[in-house]
């Protein structure tokens, strides 16, 4: 019987002894695969399936629990297969059989430990993803909210800041108008040469650019005025220019106080003025009549002398 097999196979069970070597058994135990080498049919497909399950077990926690149950079921000893194996073994394989009997006791413990580690790692990954915040930043939500609130407060300008910006805008508008007047003062009519045409075109472009900028500044000034008017509780009332800028050479006039007595006195004054005007008219008529009468008397006296 020994001559029918190659030198590497000393017995009919030599190939089974090679697969049951201690190095192969340790690698399989580290991978968490149950000890199925003592069975008659060594199924490589089952080993590959178990390896794929172990690789996928680090990502999902559900399959790991099912795999641990399958491993425990597969790790239960099968007395029928053990008896069959004992009948087919030869005396030269006693040492290998002893190792195989010790390895089934170690492999369930290693498989359960590997399954527990996979389940715990999957649970940690699930909790890490559900939490939404990285491990190094446990309180990132409140910090972000406080930063956003501070940014909103910084963006809100008070009334004094808006007035200062409006003053700077007015000064910018005045300076740009001065530049426009300076450019218009220096413009000369084109003389027909290329240099004259180019210079006039350049000045025209500068003037247009200045007017475009002035238009934008006026829009900005209007927005600032509306913002200040909204912030003011009473609103921005119109004030006379005379009260802000006193005119030189103009006498100061006290504005009358509009009271009931003042209104009555004003009405009486108007009535008296009308009466005086009527009396003046009557006196004028009387004077005219007296003049005519005197003229007639003088005429009669002159005719008698003749």
Swiss-Prot record:
Compositionally biased tracts (Low complexity): 51-128
UniProt region (Disordered), positions on chain: 1-22, 51-148
Location in or out of the cell: Nucleus
UniProt key word 4Fe-4S: no
Gene Ontology biological-process annotations: positive regulation of DNA-templated transcription
Quaternary structure, from the entry: Component of the Mediator complex.
Protein family according to the UniProt entry: Belongs to the Mediator complex subunit 30 family.
Protein name, per record: Mediator of RNA polymerase II transcription subunit 30
Organism annotation: Aedes aegypti
């Amino acid at each position: 019987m020994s001559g029918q097999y190659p030198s590497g196979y000393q017995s009919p069970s030599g190939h089974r002894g090679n697969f049951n070597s201690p190095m192969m058994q340790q690698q399989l135990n580290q991978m968490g695969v149950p000890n199925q080498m003592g069975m008659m049919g060594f199924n490589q497909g089952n080993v590959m399936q178990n390896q794929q399950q172990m690789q996928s077990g680090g990502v999902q926690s559900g399959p790991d629990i099912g795999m641990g149950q399958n491993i425990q079921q597969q790790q239960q000893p099968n007395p029928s297969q053990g008896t069959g194996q004992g009948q087919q073994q030869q005396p030269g394989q006693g040492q290998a059989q002893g190792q195989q009997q010790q390895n089934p006791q170690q492999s369930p413990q290693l498989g359960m430990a590997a399954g527990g580690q996979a389940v715990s790692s999957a649970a940690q990954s699930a909790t890490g993803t559900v939490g939404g915040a990285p491990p190094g930043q446990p309180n990132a939500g409140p910090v972000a909210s406080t930063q956003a609130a501070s940014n909103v407060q910084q963006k809100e300008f008070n009334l004094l800041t808006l007035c200062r910006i409006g003053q700077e805008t007015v000064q910018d508008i005045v300076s740009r108008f001065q530049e426009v007047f300076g450019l218009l003062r220096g413009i000369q009519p084109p003389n027909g040469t290329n240099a004259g045409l180019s210079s006039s075109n350049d000045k025209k472009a500068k003037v247009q650019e200045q007017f475009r900028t002035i238009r934008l500044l006026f829009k900005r000034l209007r927005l600032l005025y509306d913002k200040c008017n909204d912030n003011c509780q009473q609103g921005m009332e119109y004030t006379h220019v005379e009260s802000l800028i006193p005119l030189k050479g103009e006498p100061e006039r006290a504005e009358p106080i509009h009271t009931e007595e003042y209104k009555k006195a004003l009405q009486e004054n108007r009535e008296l003025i009308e009466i005086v005007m009527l009396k003046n008219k009557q006196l004028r008529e009387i004077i005219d009549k007296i003049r005519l009468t005197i003229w007639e008397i003088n005429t009669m006296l002159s005719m008698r002398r003749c």
